[in-house]
Amino acid sequence: MRRISLIILVLILCAIGLREVSRSTTWQIMGDLIHHGDRNQKVIALTFDDGPTAKYTAEILEILKAHQVPATFFLIGKFVDERPQSVAQIAQHGHEIGNHSYSHKRMALRTPAWIRTELIKTDQAIRHVGYTGPIQFRPPFGRKLLMLPYVLSSDNRTTYMWSLAPEADLGTDATADQIAHYTINATKPGDILLLHLMYSHRDQVRAALPQIIIGLKSQGYTFVTLSNLPL
């Protein structure tokens, strides 16, 4: 009985360990992972996950244009195919577009063939709208484990994560002022900031964006795209 209990305990600990490896934003089993830039330079990379949506893409682009700030948009391939005009607008405004998978399904327990299909289809969809810049990759939900890092490493592709995610830290009930205040005070040089702005229930995050930009600029921060982030 003790032996069975020990085996069960070991299996539980292994499962917990694998879960933590899959969720880590700072480490993966193989290949390159970037979650922040040079900590000695007051630069920050503003990144948005998911979408695009026609309504909110235009709103976000207007905010960025008003404050003359570049950003990196990690887009879902199937929505890129469905809403090419929104993607083209992002490209025309000079922002960077990243690959956030085609289906936005978790990629941790998938075959290499399935993973490559997701990557290739999304890259092709992004290129189809005329975007010619670099396409970085961020996994859906930040989940990785073994096969995804293996495929990315084999293809000489880097995993781009984040170092500051105010929505995750504060929860969904946080107000725009709370999100802005927290982000401005928590930001460190070289941070990669993650925000989700493309959903109807994220009004408070969109409302916080101008405050975040103004607050960080007042502290001397410069905004860059991921590909221009000093490492």
Positions of the model-derived regions?
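Terminal accessory/targeting
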Residues: M1-T47, E62-T72, K188-L231
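Active-site beta->alpha N-cap acidic-glycine motif
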Residues: S22-R110, W114, E118-A125, G133-P134
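A cross-domain feature marking catalytic cores of carbohydrate-active enzymes
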Residues: F48, L75-G77, N99-S101, P139-F141, ...
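Charged helix-capping and loop-helix junction motifs
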Residues: R116-L119, T175-A180, A207-P210
